[in-house]
């Protein structure tokens, strides 16, 4: 199931409250400030810090 892009207007990173960006290639929501990637499960964002994946600089979307 795909993410409803309209959600990006109303949800934020639970850590810094910053904007999240959708990485369509890996189906994750990315916080560029905290370098965290939140998974999607059946199109639903899982915005739990303990479920986030730490990104390295090579994985950061431009």
From Swiss-Prot:
Q: Which residues form a coiled coil?
A: none
Instruction: Give the GO cellular component terms, alphabetically.
Output: cytosol
Under Gene3D superfamilies, the record lists: 2.20.25.10
The family database entries (Pfam families) matched by this protein are listed as: Trm112p
Disulfide bond positions: none
Family membership, please give it.
Answer: Belongs to the UPF0434 family.
In Swiss-Prot or TrEMBL terms, this protein is called UPF0434 protein ASA_1553
Q: Which organism is it from?
A: Aeromonas salmonicida (strain A449)
């Amino acid at each position: 199931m795909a993410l409803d892009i309209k959600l990006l207007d109303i949800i934020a990173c639970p850590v810094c409250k910053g904007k999240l960006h959708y990485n369509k290639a890996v189906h994750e929501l990315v916080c560029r400030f905290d370098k965290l990637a939140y998974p999607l499960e059946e199109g639903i964002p899982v915005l739990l810090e303990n479920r986030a994946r730490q990104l390295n600089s090579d994985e950061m979307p431009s």
